[in-house]
Amino acid sequence: MSDYLSVTSLTKYLKMKFDRDPYLERVYLTGQVSNYRRRPSHQYFSLKDEGAVIQATIWAGVFKKIGFDLEEGMKINVVGRVQIYEPSGSYSLIIEKAEPDGIGALALQFEQLRKKLTAEGYFDDRHKQPLPNFVKKIGVITSPSGAVIRDIITTVSRRFPGVEILLFPTKVQGDGAAQEIVENIQKANQREDLDLLIVGRGGGSIEDLWAFNEEIVVQSIFESRLPVISSVGHETDTTLADFVADRRAATPTAAAELATPISKADTLAWIRERQNRAYQACLRRIQYNQERLAKLSQSVVFRQPERLYDGYLQKLDRLTTRLETFMSQDFERKQKSAEFLRQRLHGLNLSTRVKNYQDRRESLQRLLVTTTKNTINGNRVRLEKAQDALLSLDTSRIVARGYAIVNKNDKPLTTIKDITEGEQLTIQMRDGQLEVEVKNVNEKNI
């Protein structure tokens, strides 16, 4: 009986052999993922090829570091150790490292994250913010020692010298780079003096640029209140930061040009154009007013100003006639009424009362006549004043008082600034006009 081993003893012996075998401590395998269903923590599945299958396990801590998602049927290269599980007597592979076969892990991770973020709408054009035409201050998130910041400063200074640049010194590759990029984007968004951000770095391998493919960086750019221009790597390099940014620039110089779409020279040209337009508009307005003034000076109102108030005189005559008629008729009515009352009172032998009413009637009659005369006289005085004011506008009366009107090309002159020596002028006087030539022009304020 002592020659027989128990199942447990055999299993322990085999486990010891597996654990001590140096060839099984670190195994490199290529296989196809099978029976895979993602779990919240540890991952359990099979690796197979055309002739065999082995159970595989990836502990949760390792799975977080491999950087890509496993998929059913995916061919992967793994590094791990073989162990025996004593209760079942089965052996399995404990995977410590894994990467896709035929494609780099970072490339696969990039593609998987790109698909995920695309499905979530991070790269939709409807989320893109427009870049401002004019900026006062630009925030730049990049390394302080690289060529990126020098190219940006040079280009912005050339295109629009007045624009300020605020550098946020940032680690752009290696451990902690993604977190530092996120922190500086958040700092920039807390400032009120920035108009937009440029986020970028120079060229490099996919590993060097990887910080700009991290999901936290993409989310930070997406949530930025400030418009973001991405300039990562060379023209052929593409990162997820480029997809989510409001604009992507192939080079730092191109990013600076996008940040200052209208240069100082363009702005000055635009201002000069607007000034010229305003000047031409003023000239046209002045010419229009001069022509209108010339036409008005030849109108009937200026040549025969008395016609301006002819209608008012006729209306005043009609109103005066109506007033006189009304006063006369009213007086007659009151006189008849008084006579009627006098006769009634006389018939009642109330001589004293009649006498009082007669006195009152005569007093009212005198008051009415006086009021009527005063009203008519007042209206006549106002009419005469209006008539005198209008007559004062008559150029013939002005000339009659000893003044003269100087015309140039049949237009009245109001200033010597419109006269040059040698010009022919016409002087209108009371009894005729003179044709004169200007010999000298002396400016003098009166």
From Swiss-Prot:
Localization per Swiss-Prot or TrEMBL: Cytoplasm
Single GO MF annotation: nucleic acid binding
Gene Ontology terms: cellular component: cytoplasm; exodeoxyribonuclease VII complex
BP terms from Gene Ontology: DNA catabolic process
Keywords: Cytoplasm, Exonuclease, Hydrolase, Nuclease
Superkingdom assignment: Bacteria
Catalytic activity: Exonucleolytic cleavage in either 5'- to 3'- or 3'- to 5'-direction to yield nucleoside 5'-phosphates
Chief localization: cytoplasm
Signal peptide: none
EC number(s) on file: 3.1.11.6
PANTHER family: EXODEOXYRIBONUCLEASE 7 LARGE SUBUNIT (PTHR30008:SF0)
NCBIfam families: xseA
Family: Belongs to the XseA family.
Function: Bidirectionally degrades single-stranded DNA into large acid-insoluble oligonucleotides, which are then degraded further into small acid-soluble oligonucleotides.
Subunit structure, interactors included: Heterooligomer composed of large and small subunits.
Protein name: Exodeoxyribonuclease 7 large subunit
Species per Swiss-Prot/TrEMBL record: Streptococcus thermophilus (strain ATCC BAA-250 / LMG 18311)
Name of the gene this protein is made from: xseA
